[in-house]
């Protein structure tokens, strides 16, 4: 499937994004992980677009471009590279991404997406996918996170704090061992979503490590990734049609 490069004007500049799929389908915003927009995420977007969706993969680090490229298998084992990535994460706040998300939604509309929109995020993108649903409750119908970190941390911008604003259905796939989303956060998120009457599922992928879904990651697990695809495509089929 052909990738089309587009530019999206935001409050802070211009974000590059990849667009996949044909006009007429429901829209999906894929929020990247900490290693940035790259071929591995393009492959994932292509697979999702093959289900009939129009998939947008924006570069969330556009304010600091050019950067990288980063090798997801080794980036955090090299101190200098790890420092660069952490700097990008710190400098790209949830509030920035939420402001950008309005522009991302508008871009999908310009590309012919008139119906419901879903979000899915990996790693740092998981929290952003859920927070986008809170920021745009009347535009986002489904939000999914896989190995998303800090979904119910003590940070003010942690998604569980925004549960009462979410109207979308929510799916969270957590890695079995993940310091960024330990069991106590899972319980806190579940409590917040249930109290807010959010239709949700939180599923633990036992034996999987943070990053298992993304094919260029060092902990990629094919069986676990295929299970993630089954859940994600089923979730969107139920919510975006």
Could you say what each language-model-derived stretch is?
Residues 1-241:
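N-terminal cap/leader regions of alpha/beta-hydrolase-fold enzymes
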């Amino acid at each position: 499937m052909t990738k089309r490069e587009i530019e999206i004007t935001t409050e802070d500049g211009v974000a590059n994004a990849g667009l996949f799929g044909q006009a007429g389908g429901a829209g999906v915003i894929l929020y990247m992980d900490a290693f940035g927009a790259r071929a591995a995420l393009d492959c994932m977007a292509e697979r999702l677009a093959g289900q009939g969706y129009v998939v947008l993969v924006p570069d969330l680090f556009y304010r600091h471009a050019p950067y990288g490229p980063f090798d997801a298998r080794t980036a955090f084992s090299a101190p200098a590279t790890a420092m660069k990535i952490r700097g990008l994460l710190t400098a790209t706040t949830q509030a920035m991404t939420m402001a950008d998300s309005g522009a991302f939604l508008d871009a999908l509309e310009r590309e012919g997406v008139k119906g419901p929109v879903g979000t899915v995020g990996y790693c740092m993108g998981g929290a952003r996918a859920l927070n986008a649903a809170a920021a745009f409750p009347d535009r986002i119908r489904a939000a999914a996170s896989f190995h998303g970190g800090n979904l119910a941390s003590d940070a003010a911008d942690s998604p569980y704090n925004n549960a009462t604003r979410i109207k979308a259905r929510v799916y969270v796939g957590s890695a079995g061992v993940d310091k960024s989303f330990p069991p106590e956060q899972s319980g806190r998120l579940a409590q917040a979503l249930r109290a807010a009457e959010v239709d949700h599922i939180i599923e633990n992928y036992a034996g999987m490590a943070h990053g298992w879904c993304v094919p260029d990651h060092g902990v990629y697990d094919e069986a676990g990734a295929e299970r993630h695809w089954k859940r994600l495509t089923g979730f969107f089929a139920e919510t975006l049609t």
